[in-house]
């Protein structure tokens, strides 16, 4: 039967042996160390004084790390057991009574967690697509990695020399990466599977890099960035090469958003315009004119919202769900949110915020649009009621609310089974698997997680 050490490669075995010998030496167990050297057939040169210093304390750190991991696993197993028990005892009636229908869930105060560690304003938050991991980027030049389920800080990632302006998880299916961009003119790729090691730094922009996103595709090959240098750039993830530069804006580009299928790019800028681009050809397709100040944010509407937006647009039937760029939403420093069709026609202006709009997110089920603003609030706009604001989370933060993300969850198609709406099955419906979790960041230096 194989022992665990047999699964280690030679380099890992050497490191383990050196760590054990260093532990014996530090513990005064010289005879035991000598016996192990003899058993291994190695001399003093295997672990000289310099190497000894390097490996001192390694074994203890690994041991305490394993204990912490075991504790976390036990906590998660306990929570999983509790949630499974709740699920097993739930009925359609109880689910409806408790108002946990995911398609209608909206955030409410108080937040589930307030994550505190940053020392300056927070500019961006991003959810890991699989695990309960949340990243936040700040003016303090750091990235913080949190377990949003437990509300705990896992690590601080350092590397940028100026403010971290945006973050995103994505990339190749073989291994999810984290990308960040900064006022230091760089974009950095980090590997979550290797302690968030910086694996690549992308340079090429001539001014602050405002926004960055992985472009969705089967291979996860590319990412796109927006900059104060008035350009968008498309980069190859594997090499870090810039493969495309897109020009057209006449001022600082504040935001960029790819469509869910990666075919289109949407950019918003200080020139008060939003622009639609073909991602593969860089061809400009449409310009959205109507805001009276800087456009801070832009987002594509998901197909789940098409029926509601089609009604607002006065269409007899919604566009096909296979299309990825039928409607968009933009938020501006003019304190308004605007809804548009893909041709640049303004459909609706949503008024209610008392300060700059900083970020937008569509509810995955398509019924609502959420926004955060420098007025410190989260507002929820009901697209089935002509975009009426149906909920406001007042004082969501104690300072400007700067960023917003909805935790991702995959859509599932029910073909031979039954879908459920408000806990009541309906045959042949599409089920949107909504994760009822959002995160917001603020100039108050806190990240808040709102969850059901």
Swiss-Prot record:
Entry superkingdom: Eukaryota
Key words of the record: Cell cycle, Cell division, Coiled coil, Cytoplasm, Cytoskeleton, Microtubule, Mitosis, Repeat, Transport, WD repeat
UniProt WD repeat ranges: 117-158, 160-200, 204-245, 248-287, 290-350, 352-391, 396-435, 437-452
UniProt cross-references to InterPro entries, sorted A to Z: Dynein_regulator_LIS1, G-protein_beta_WD-40_rep, LIS1_N, LisH, PAC1-like_LisH-like_dom, WD40/YVTN_repeat-like_dom_sf, WD40_repeat_CS, WD40_repeat_dom_sf
Major subcellular site: cytoplasm
GO cellular-component term (any): spindle pole
Example GO BP: cell division
Location relative to the cell: Cytoplasm, Cytoskeleton; Cytoplasm, Cytoskeleton, Spindle pole
One of the record's GO molecular function terms: dynein complex binding
Coiled coil: 64-91
A family per Pfam: LisH_PAC1
Keyword set includes NADP: no
Start and end residues of each LisH domain: 12-44
Self-association state and partner proteins as the record states: Self-associates. Interacts with NDL1 and dynein.
Entry similarity comment: Belongs to the WD repeat LIS1/nudF family.
Biological function: Positively regulates the activity of the minus-end directed microtubule motor protein dynein. May enhance dynein-mediated microtubule sliding by targeting dynein to the microtubule plus end. Required for nuclear migration during vegetative growth as well as development. Required for retrograde early endosome (EE) transport from the hyphal tip. Required for localization of dynein to the mitotic spindle poles. Recruits additional proteins to the dynein complex at SPBs.
Domain notes: Dimerization mediated by the LisH domain may be required to activate dynein.
The protein, known as: Nuclear distribution protein PAC1
Species this chain originates from: Tuber melanosporum (strain Mel28) (Perigord black truffle)
Gene that encodes it: PAC1
